Amino acid sequence: MAKNVIKRIFPKLDSVKEEKILKVFGPAVLQPNLWHINKKSVSRGFAIGAFCAFLPIPGIQMILAAFLSITFAANLPLAVILTWITNPFTYIPIVYFAIKIGGIFINAEFTYEIKNEQINIFTDLMQYWEPLFLGSFILSIISSLLSYILIRMYWRYYVIKTWSKRKKF
């Protein structure tokens, strides 16, 4: 199962205690349940990571995911790693899709024309901040709910499958 792979990849709590950068969060980051791999913490971690990934706040997504993980006792490493769904390669298509989605709800049409002069996408996008934020929030909610439900369903399926194999022996 993916649980065993994740356990091998993720750091152990003892090694986390020695990391200087994590001391900023204080003793809250050292709660053992933030580092355990179980159905509740993994599904919460996926939901938080997916939620933060689609918010249009690059650079702050990981900090927000860490804070929400501590608040809701979710798997901290998973939540932080999943914020990288939006990375330098995927950010522009996700922003475009978020603006399109937001535009549908507030009846704003999005047309972007690339000029031959200087391309400054972020300055040009400021005129579309309303559909961007609304669309990003909608994508965040949908992706977090879907990831939470799908992880819970997969976990249940895997446990049932494992138990049925044990019964055969």
Language-model features and meaning:
Residues 92-118:
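Juxtamembrane non-transmembrane "cap" segments at the membrane-aqueous interface
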Residues 35-61:
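Transmembrane alpha-helical segments and their cytosolic interface motifs
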Residues 49, 69, 98-106, 147-159:
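Membrane-water interface at transmembrane helix exits
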Residues 43-47, 78, 126, 130:
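Alpha-helical membrane-protein architecture signal
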Residues 47, 51, 81-85, 134, ...:
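Hydrophobic residues within alpha-helical transmembrane segments
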Residues 55-96:
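Transmembrane helix boundary and interhelical junction motifs in multipass membrane proteins
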Residues 1-40, 117-169:
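Terminal, membrane-proximal amphipathic helices
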Residues 53, 90-94, 140-147:
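Alpha-helical transmembrane segments
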